[in-house]
Amino acid sequence: MSFLWEDRAWEDYLYWQVQDKETLKRINALVKDACRTPFSGLGKPEPLRGNLSGYWSRRINEEDRLIYLYENGQLKIIACRGHYED
């Protein structure tokens, strides 16, 4: 499976590289797991609703979520900092 980073998600990822290595490790583990099993596994995956219908969320920590879209065998990472309401 391939994956790609939206611009915002990549900026988030670069932020974590500087700010918090433990959070970065958690994000890496979540991305790896989402590539293997997009709809189950680490971080309590849950489908989003409303204007984010079709997207999925996994918990990085209490405040931050990994938001992604799985489509046609590709994982598209939308954000990895903040919450989906942000």
Regions found by a protein language model. Give the residues of each.
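Generic structural signal for secondary-structure transition and capping sites
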Residues: R36-F39
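Enriched for short, Lys/Arg-rich terminal
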Residues: S2, R8-L24, A29, L42, ...
